[in-house]
Every structure is written in structure tokens, then in C-alpha cells.
From Swiss-Prot:
Family: Belongs to the enoyl-CoA hydratase/isomerase family. MenB subfamily.
Protein's organism: Staphylococcus aureus (strain MSSA476)
Composition bias, Basic and acidic residues: 254-265
GO cellular component entries: cytosol
The keyword Lyase is annotated on this UniProt entry: yes
Name of this chain's protein: 1,4-dihydroxy-2-naphthoyl-CoA synthase
Pfam families registered for this protein in UniProt: ECH_1 (PF00378)
Amino acid sequence: MTNRQWETLREYDEIKYEFYEGIAKVTINRPEVRNAFTPKTVSEMIDAFSRARDDQNVSVIVLTGEGDLAFCSGGDQKKRGHGGYVGEDQIPRLNVLDLQRLIRIIPKPVIAMVKGYAVGGGNVLNVVCDLTIAADNAIFGQTGPKVGSFDAGYGSGYLARIVGHKKAREIWYLCRQYNAQEALDMGLVNTVVPLEKVEDETVQWCKEIMKHSPTALRFLKAAMNADTDGLAGLQQMAGDATLLYYTTDEAKEGRDAFKEKRDPDFDQFPKFP
């Protein structure tokens, strides 16, 4: 593996947030519990992803877990209380749902770099990422029905879009675990590489993506999300279109005419068929 110097952009307690040549990397840093997340972990990830979204130097975001044994094993069951996962404020939450949605609406590609276990809520995080680079030691699966839990949102509905309804039901009903090759065969990941090469491969994919139009990628992501996200997906795509329209001379003419208290001259702009 190439020895890269990742720059720490912000210090957190339960995650790492780093940067390298246009790539932001968010790492769940709780290896002692196979990178299971708490409400605090999720809050920190939401903050880091929000910063990556706003950072003009970031083109692609990578989500991963600390160490080689686990990407993420889902919610920390020791923190699970009455009505959700209980944080330091003693309020039960399911704020990972907010994180899932954020990953979907960020107008930049998000790549899951999976080493070891991606199970339970960890597999759902893998599912909502745009792409997945898996190490050959990766293990995928859902555990919810074993521990009195389930994900009836992206973790089931969108999973079924990816792997097919029959396979998604198998994954949830049987709670089996699947190796990297099996995950590749069902379309749950994009590629499988040796563990020692997984970061090199992920960075290579990021660099290839960064050669392409960020606006085109933004609209492609929004378009592919729109059919599964209902009106919220259409709102996201419409918002992206509005932002792009604001950059045109036609939109600026309307704005300037209002500010200058005159009628806008829209006849000067082409009316494409």
C-alpha cells in the first residue's frame, strides 16, 4: 500500500476526518467494538460530512472504519435504550437515519471503503454510499431480527433495488453473512481487491472521478436517487437545477432587472427546442 500523508482537518472523539488531494476521508474510530456507532459517533459523522459538502477543495468523500477487522458493525447495542440509542444527553435517538439521508443528498460521490465486517447498520451505511470498494476480507449482512431491530427504510427498500427483492428478503429473514465475492456477485459492492491494496484502489477510483465534470456528477447522483427518494429526491434534483440556472445570464437578467426596477429583457436569450 502506498504511504499517503492524510491531513487531519478536524479532531473528533469517535471518528477521524482527513484530507488527501481532493479526497475527504471519514473514519469510524471505535475499533475496540468493531466500529459500532453511538449517537455521538453519528453526530460527529454528520458534522464531518457537512463540512466535506461545503469544502470546495473536496471532490469525493470516502467512508471507512479504523483497522482491518471492521468497516462498521452497526449501532452499539450497549448504548441501546428505550426508544433508541442513548447518548451523553440521555436522549434516545436514531440519528443514523439523518446520516443516511445526508450521504444520499450530498452532491459529491461518496465511496464506502470496506475492510472486514459491514453488518447491521454498518451494511446499511455501505448500501447508501454511491460506490463500494471491498477488501477481500469484507463480510456483509444484516443482524436486526437477531437483536430485535430492523431498518425498514434504505436498509430494506433500497437494498432490494440493488440486489433484488428475493435476495434482500433472504438477507433480512435469514441474517446470514456474505463474503466479498458473494457481495460482488449480488451487486452489493463494485469491486473486490486484496486487503493491502484497498486504499490504493479507492484512491484510484477517486482520482478517476475527479477528472470528470462535478456538475454532471451532481445531476447524475440526484437523478439516480430521485426515483427511490420520492418528492424529497425530486426536490433535491430541482434544487440542483435551480443552482445551475442561477449561474446563467438569463437568471442574472431577471435578478438585475428586479434590483434596477425595470422590466427584464428575456427576448435576448435562446429558446432551445
